[in-house]
């Protein structure tokens, strides 16, 4: 259990695409989310420079959220912290190792919220500055538990 999980050896010089899977993720703070930041040349970018657009689907309907000045990009939305209120999902990250391009991500997750309501969440995020991304930080305001896996995909 930790509030932060860092991936600093992502071999961004080898892989064009990175793929996270999240299985049975729990957060200790009710209605918290799992968020993502990038390391640029070894330093975490924590400024309000990220952009994202998200569609949320739940039993009450649909909603949209977006930002052009966030300090993170989302991965998993507002899960509950009770038994069986786990979150599952995935995130693709593109162009991390290419200092001439912006770094993009897409994500999709499902969870039971604190009410508990079933929730599906999908969208995309952007670091709109050309930089060498060489690591990823996943974080939450409370402890994170569950299984997080990172895979590299190489183009030929």
Briefly describe each language-model feature range.
Residues 1-156:
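Surface-exposed molecular-recognition determinants
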């Amino acid at each position: 259990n930790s509030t932060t999980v860092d991936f600093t050896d992502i071999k961004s010089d080898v892989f064009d695409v990175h793929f996270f899977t999240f299985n049975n993720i729990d957060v200790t703070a009710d209605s918290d989310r799992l968020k993502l930041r990038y390391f640029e040349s070894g330093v975490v970018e924590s400024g309000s420079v990220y952009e994202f657009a998200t569609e949320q689907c739940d039993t009450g309907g649909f909603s949209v959220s977006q930002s052009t000045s966030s300090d993170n990009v989302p991965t998993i939305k507002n899960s509950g912290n009770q038994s069986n209120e786990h979150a599952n999902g995935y995130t693709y990250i593109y162009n991390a190792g290419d200092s001439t391009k912006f770094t993009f991500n897409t994500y999709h997750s499902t969870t039971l919220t604190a009410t508990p309501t079933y929730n599906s969440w999908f969208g995309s995020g952007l670091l709109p500055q050309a930089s060498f991304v060489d690591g990823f930080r996943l974080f939450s305001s409370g402890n994170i538990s569950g299984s997080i896996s990172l895979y590299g995909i190489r183009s030929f």
